UniProtKB/Swiss-Prot annotation:
S-S bridge residues: none
Official protein name in the record: YcgL domain-containing protein Sputw3181_2259
SUPFAM superfamilies attached to this UniProt entry: YcgL-like (SSF160191)
Any Pfam family hit: YcgL
Record-linked PANTHER family: PROTEIN YCGL
Span of domain YcgL: 1-85
InterPro entries the record matches: YcgL-like_sf (IPR038068), YcgL_dom (IPR027354)
Length: 92
């Protein structure tokens, strides 16, 4: 199975994986509105891949099979200063 990846024009580091190029029928309208105009990143055979950069390949495959799409969002940013203060036992 081929997988097509698009990046969001509205949300940084946010990617949408779908089964077919330019086919967003399974993606909810509210998600598409938040995502913005999809920009094509790549098309690849997902069955032949063992890993992906930031996403768990098994979760991506399962989501595409069940929902027709997978949304990859960036991990939350860590406040390094607050973490350092916490490690030192200091309060904010």
């Amino acid at each position: 199975m081929l997988c097509t990846v698009y990046k969001s024009t509205r949300k940084a580091d946010t990617y949408l994986f779908v089964k077919k190029r330019d086919c967003f029928d399974d993606v909810p309208e509210a998600l598409m509105a938040m995502f913005g105009t999809p920009q094509l990143v790549m098309v690849f055979p997902i069955a032949k891949r063992e890993s992906l950069g930031m996403a768990d390949i098994h979760k991506v495959r399962a989501a595409i099979d069940e929902n027709g799409y997978y949304l990859q969002i960036p991990p939350p940013q860590v406040n390094l200063l607050a973490e350092h203060k916490r490690n030192l036992g200091l309060q904010d």
